[in-house]
């Protein structure tokens, strides 16, 4: 039953994907800087907003969702959180690209879509990028924050767990934090096929490969507790709120229905993660579960405003 539910959720991802949204608010911000960094994947574009007070010690990385584009990060396309956080005296870094990557170091290139270069996003985000930011801007490479939506939410917790000196704050907004739950691995497989025809076996191997467990926040929750990582975990209920496009066209109906299903899966994962943290005595976390909300940018942008004081008090 759970597996069937997860697959049912994953199948419509071509309409509204994990990390997808329907409402664009910002698009290109001329006040941000392009910053290209060399890596094993080639040159990677990043967008940088400087803190208004000029400090170099307070830095946050914002991670995209499954359909991350190669021109701009979804956070810039769909929201205004870059300039907002900069106004709160936080330096903002948005890596660009990484479709279906889970921001992980992959085992191999994906053979389904002719991928030429193996993803090595974990290495990039924890080695190439912080070193380059330190050299170019003088940014501090420890006690940073990392926040992501959906796919990026899972990755944010993973990166914080295994790189605690770099990231002492991690936020998951509608993330998938229990990927060993029944049906989740199948759902991820289908979603990645839909978003770029990626073979999930190239990422973490077959379902029995230990790499799946290494990247499951539910499994490595004790690392976050032991590191005393400050966490922010949020999700909606899957119930649409006034203002969600649901009646104007068939596309609106399908998008909102898919967004509802995705958010139901996310909140179930996030609630299970909450139970796990409580069971192991991990309390350095804020949960922000909303009574309404689907898998959409219009809900993630307000979360950044909500968590900004907590982030500001922790990083640097």
Report residues per predicted region.
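Non-catalytic cap/lid and distal C-terminal segments of serine-dependent acyl enzymes
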Residues: 2-3, 14-316
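Hydrophobic helical h-region of N-terminal Sec-dependent signal peptides
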Residues: 5-11
């Amino acid at each position: 039953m759970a597996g069937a539910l997860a697959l049912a959720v994953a199948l419509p991802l071509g309409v509204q994907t994990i990390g997808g949204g329907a409402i664009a608010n910002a698009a290109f911000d001329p006040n941000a800087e392009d910053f290209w960094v060399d890596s094993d994947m080639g040159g990677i574009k990043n967008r940088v907003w400087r803190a208004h007070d000029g400090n170099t010690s307070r830095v946050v990385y914002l991670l995209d969702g499954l359909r991350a584009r190669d021109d701009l990060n979804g956070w810039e396309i769909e929201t205004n959180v870059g300039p907002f956080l900069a106004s709160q005296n936080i330096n903002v870094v948005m890596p660009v690209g990484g479709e279906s990557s889970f921001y992980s170091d992959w085992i191999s290139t994906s053979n389904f879509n002719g991928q030429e270069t193996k993803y090595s996003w974990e290495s990039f985000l924890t080695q190439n990028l912080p070193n380059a930011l330190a050299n170019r801007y003088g940014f501090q490479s420890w006690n940073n924050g990392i926040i992501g939506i959906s796919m990026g939410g899972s990755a944010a917790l993973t990166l914080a767990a295994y790189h605690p000196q770099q990231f002492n704050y991690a936020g998951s907004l509608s993330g998938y934090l229990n990927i060993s739950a029944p049906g989740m691995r199948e759902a991820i497989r289908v979603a990645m096929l839909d978003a770029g025809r990626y073979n999930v076996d190239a990422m973490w191997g077959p379902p029995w490969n230990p790499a799946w467990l290494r990247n499951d926040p539910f499994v490595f929750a004790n690392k976050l507790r032991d590191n005393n990582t400050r966490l922010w975990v949020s999700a909606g209920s899957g119930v649409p709120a006034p203002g969600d496009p649901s009646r104007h066209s068939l596309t609106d109906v399908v998008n909102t229905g898919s967004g509802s299903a995705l958010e139901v899966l996310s909140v179930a994962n996030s609630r299970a993660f909450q139970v796990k943290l409580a069971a192991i005595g991990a309390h350095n976390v804020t949960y922000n579960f909303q009574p309404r909300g689907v898998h959409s940018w219009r809900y993630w942008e307000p979360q950044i405003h909500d968590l900004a004081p907590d982030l500001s008090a922790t990083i640097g």
